Amino acid sequence: MQITKQLWSKAVTKAPLLPLPTKTKVSLAYKLHMPNKTVTPNLTIRSHEPIVFLHGVFGSKKNYGDICQTIANTTHTPVYAIDFRNHGESEHCFPLVNYSQLSKDVVDFCEEHDLKRVSIVGYSLGAKVGLLTMLKHPKLVNSGVIIGNAPIETPQVKVYLKVFLKAMTALIDSAHIKATDKNWREKARAVMSKYIPDASIVQYLLRNVLNKKSSHIPGHTDLISVQMPISHFNKDVIDDISDWPAEEVKGLKFEGPVKVVKGLKSAFITKEGEKAYAEHFPNYTMSTFNTNHLIFAEMPSRVTKTVCDFIKLTRYQLLQQHTRDGKHHTIQKVDPALLNSSEASTVEQATKQL
């Protein structure tokens, strides 16, 4: 990933700011993706183990709508795509980006919506939040697919985050693009491209740009705005995003199945990261793709298939385990339509024993 390095200033934006409240509990915005009835018209077995999709930094549920719907259709499972605090349509408040708080927000969301034994799919920032949630709340999580990150500090991400913030704050401080300008999006793209030559990253970040009044900067009544409160994002936030609460999870393990997806051209999952996976997630497996960090953007179909295949296979294996153990009350029954003919026959026989 080639980007232009810029000097970092203490003041992220020159614009005056509206104050943000401090909250330990927020109601997260979300999009519920239900399996398409045209895909599964005769589906009678509903999943009691929903999927919670956690997006990356500067992203939102909007970035992954098609992917989440495909996962829902393929796994016959409801997918809850959430917006983290200070992202997408969720509330702006302090703490801005803190892993312990973000994980608590996910747990609160699951409790609010009565979600139990969830499968977590987390990308980048969402990957670390998902990992922390699995370690601290293992009874809540059934399995996880973790994409493009590891349970360690990742200082290498800081240079990218600084440039991304520079590009977006340039839209606020100096671009002066009118919200009524019919070419506002292309003009915003041109401004950001001066800082970030990678078109796929610019496209990703443009999802934050709106042709409406800013919610956190007074006086921006007729200009385009950035949906996130990035004007409050300073060096401390950059440090928080690259951090990992190692002391908080010392000695903790998640024994459930975990699939790690790694981009071979990305520096996010190092040998140290793989060692940390082995320490905390003894039942993890890894799939690699010849991509950079934006794995979903570069190979959306292949990565989505990996997610779906893992979730389906995991449920099949857990059903077998529960059957062998004689456990009947918490079984997630598997629709044979999800599996190949051999697996479906095995599941059918196992289900008769429940």
Swiss-Prot record:
Superkingdom assignment: Eukaryota
InterPro entries: AB_hydrolase_1, AB_hydrolase_fold
Regions annotated as coiled coil: none
UniProt key word Transferase: yes
A Pfam short name: Abhydrolase_1
Swiss-Prot/TrEMBL keywords: Hydrolase, Transferase
Active-site feature positions: S124 (charge relay system), H293 (charge relay system)
Entry's EC annotation: 2.3.1.-
GO MF: hydrolase activity; transferase activity
Family, as annotated: Belongs to the AB hydrolase superfamily.
UniProt function note: Probable alcohol acetyltransferase that uses acetyl-CoA to synthesize acetate esters from various alcohols. Not involved in the synthesis of ethyl acetate.
Protein name as it appears in the record: Probable alcohol acetyltransferase
Source species of the chain: Cyberlindnera jadinii (strain ATCC 18201 / CBS 1600 / BCRC 20928 / JCM 3617 / NBRC 0987 / NRRL Y-1542)
